Each structure stands twice: as C-alpha cells, then as structure tokens.
Amino acid sequence: MEGLLLLLPTAIIALYLYISLIRRSRKKHNLPPGSDGWPFLGETFSYLKPHSAISIGRFMEDHISRYGKIYRSNLFGEPTIVSADAELNRFVLQNEGRLFECSYPRSIGGILGKWSMLVLVGDMHRDMRMISLNFMSAARLRTRLMPEVERQTLLVLRSWREGSTFSAQEEAKKFTFNLMAKHIMSMDPGEPETEMLRREYITFMKGVVSAPLNFPGTPYWKALKSRSSILAVIERKMEERIGRRDRGDGGVEDDDLLGWAMNQSNLLKEQILDLLLSLLFAGHETSSMALALAIYFLESCPEAVRDLRDEHLAISMSGKEGECGLSWDQYKQMEFTHCVINESLRLGNVVRFVHRKAIQDVQYKGYDIPCGWKVLPVFAAVHLDSTLYSDPHRFNPWRWQSSSSKTTAANFMPYGGGLRLCTGSELAKLEMAVFLHHLVLNYQWKLAEPEQAFAYPFLDFPKGLQIKVRAIT
C-alpha cells in the first residue's frame, strides 16, 4: 500500500507532463483535427478493433466523417497523423529517407529481429533490399522461380480429394510456405525438418500479431521461443554449407537465398539470419492471404470464374508442342488474371497500413506534421474510397479493364511504394497467377459454410475458409 502511495505522485506528474506536451504541440503547430483519446493508451484499442476486411471499420469511418481524411490521434503510444488521403499517402512513401522513415513498434523489431528489412532504415535497409531484389530479379523469376512455383502448385492441388472439404486458407499457407522454404533454404515439402519449421512458424506468427507481453505462456513469449528454433535451423544450414564449401563440395543448394546471401554479400551471420526470417514472414503470410482472398471473392462471382477459365483454356492451348509446364510468354498473356489479382488485393487489403515517422517538420495541405510524430498511411481507406473507385465494396475485376483503369491504378498501393516497395511483389503476383491457372482448369469450388475475412488488423478467415471441391473432368 505504501509503495502504491509513493507511485501515485509520480503517475500524476507524468500525466501532467504528457498533457502539457500535447497542448504545447497543438499551440505551436497547425495540426489536423482529431482526438488524443486516453492518456498513454490513446485510441489504439478502438483503432485495432476487428472488423470486416472489406470495410475500414467503425473507428476509421467515424473519424473520417468527423475530421476528414487527414486527422490526428494517439496510437501505439505515440501522437499520430492518420491519412486516408491518397495524395498524402503517396507523398509519405515517395519521401522515404528525406522527410519520413519507417517506424514500427519496438515489439515488431523484438520478434522479427533488429536486422529485419521491415524495421531497418537507411543504408543497411538499402543493402538488404538490394540482395532481395537481385535474388528475385525478372531473369530469375523466368528461369528459376516460375518452374518451382508451378511444381509447388501442382503438389497442393493434386492432394485434394474429389468432394472433400478443407480449409482453403491453410492450403494457401501450405503452398506459399513450402515455396518460400524451397526458395530460401532448398527445403523440400513434407520432409520432417520442413514440417517442424512450419509448425514453429505458425506459433511464431501468432506472436507477431499479439500483444508484446513477454512472460511464460503468452503468444509473444511462445513466438520468441519459436524464433529461436527457426533461427537454429537456419544457422545449422549455414554451418553445413560452410563445411561443404571448405571441402570444395558445392551444390544446387547454393542457388537459394541462403546461398545467395552467404556468397554474394558481406552480411554478418546475425544479419543473414534476420534477413531470411523476415523474408519467410513477408513472402509466406501476405501471399497466402492474398490467394485465399482471391478464392473467396471468386466463389461468389461466377462471371469472373467463367472469364478466368476461358482465358486459361486459351493459354493452355497456346503452348508449344513438347513444352512442359507454363512458359513465361503464357504467363504474360494472363491479362484478366491480373485484373482478378488486383481486385482481390484492392478489396481485401492484406496490408492495410504502414508505420512511418516524420524526421523533420513537414507541411502538407495546410497542416503541420511535427518532427517525431508517427504517420499512418492507410491504404485500405484509399482502396475503399467511393470517390476513387465506383461501388468500392463490390468485387469487380473488370474495373481494371476500363478506360479509367490508369486512374484506378494510380491510387492502388497493395505493396506499399517508394524506396520500400515490396521486393517480392512480382513473385507474389506470379504465385497467384500460376495457382489460379491450375485451380480454374481443374476444380470447381464452393464455400462449405458462410464465411468472411476479418481485419484484426492482420487479415484472417475465422473459420479457415472451408471449401468443398469438385474436379473438372
């Protein structure tokens, strides 16, 4: 009791200083309108309240209605400018490193690692990004990655039994995880070590999106344990290759990302470990959710499935005699497929917002963004803006074929933008296109029970997106 009484004056002083700081900032700057919410807590819990993935949620709707598309708040423990404005979002992303920099909560860096590309800034981020870009270059996509994408697609689809019911979300995760494990460390699907890594990764992901409470039994604590297990696997692979290299016994494995980072960069072991872990996270989780969304939206739009199937029937008949598998030229013919991919990403919004911080005082549209303030460009709010997209809550892949498609594309940021544009965006589109090609040619599907995607803010299908499939004969 005595200890609590001693803490009370400290808490009151801290609260007073916090309120005084906010008030001084308001007087000094012409801030956007908004609300600071509760001291310290701000409005974070309301902002993160789960809602339908094809909406921006009650919090955003109410704040935009009351304050406009640019407003201030207090989120994640920091004063924040929230932007549902397409022009400001582009301005923030295009001025990375000059006016703004990446600024995720510390808990993200704690679990992904301090050398993760998601949290790095400056020269180190540039160097890590270059390694990733070179590994996933257009030439490698054509020659090395596309055949493997098709192989992993067929492995998953051929395991489906006629008339069976299963989780499409889990199948999508299995597909993208096996693909990334193969690309990153040449690990084959179904092998005990690969399956162990996948189980650890499931635990790891639950912690990434949980509250950062690090004590035994919490998802965050379990995720840190899984992080250690995953890194141990990567480190063991590194040591095996160093041993083979010392013996002059190289191999095909050196052509994966681990070999690429070891042989064509000056990265330290710790940096390579965090790089591979973060790319496994980025390449698996977002791509699998995007694919699950496409399956979900297509199920309720038979016209789109019909047009998609017609396109892929024509493509499958265009192959050259003796040619095995899809060619790059055939992939480039998948025009409507890319409309479906774009629309799934626009409506579903896998990446709903990003974290940035002003590194100097910035003025925009008459408002001040003070140095040190967080800025959240909310892509979902732009993608679902009725002034930019007609009937924005309807799945309409044909909108990407219209005369206004250039305007539509200008406001489309599913992979971020600027210096931090997702390095795996082309690979992600390739994965979805190849999977959809074989899916629509070989199967019909329907939802086994009513379902919808929710934003937590990470996306998830609460029931796993259960579907029932029937083979096309």
From Swiss-Prot:
The effect annotated for T203S is: Mimicking CYP90G4, increased cholesterol 16S,22S-dihydroxylase activity and production of furostanol-type steroid
Principal location: membrane
**Which Pfam family would be a valid example here?**
p450
Q: What is the effect of changing L145F?
A: Mimicking CYP90G4, increased cholesterol 16S,22S-dihydroxylase activity and production of furostanol-type steroid
| Associated pathway | Steroid metabolism; cholesterol metabolism
Any single GO BP term: steroid biosynthetic process
Q: TM segments? A: 2-22
- Per the UniProt entry, the signal peptide is none
Topology in the lipid bilayer is annotated as: Single-pass membrane protein
Listed under catalytic activity are: cholesterol + reduced [NADPH--hemoprotein reductase] + O2 = (22S)-22-hydroxycholesterol + oxidized [NADPH--hemoprotein reductase] + H2O + H(+)
One GO cellular component this record assigns the protein to is:
membrane
**Recorded GO MF terms:** heme binding; iron ion binding; monooxygenase activity; oxidoreductase activity, acting on paired donors, with incorporation or reduction of molecular oxygen
Q: In which tissues is it expressed?
A: Mainly expressed in leaves and roots and, at low levels, in fruits and stems.
Q: Which domain of life is it from?
A: Eukaryota
Q: Where in the cell is it found?
A: Membrane
Under the heading InterPro entries, the entry gives: Cyt_P450, Cyt_P450_E_grp-I, Cyt_P450_sf
Please name the top-level EC class of this enzyme.
oxidoreductase
Q: Name the keywords, alphabetized.
A: Brassinosteroid biosynthesis, Cholesterol metabolism, Iron, Lipid biosynthesis, Lipid metabolism, Membrane, Metal-binding, Oxidoreductase, Steroid biosynthesis, Steroid metabolism, Sterol metabolism, Transmembrane, Transmembrane helix
Q: What does this protein do?
A: Canonical brassinosteroid (BR)-biosynthetic enzyme capable of converting cholesterol to 22S-hydroxycholesterol via sterol-C22 hydroxylation.
Family statement: Belongs to the cytochrome P450 family.
What is the name listed in the Swiss-Prot or TrEMBL entry for this protein?
Answer: Cholesterol 22-monohydroxylase CYP90B52
Supply the source organism for this entry. Answer: Paris polyphylla (Daiswa polyphylla)
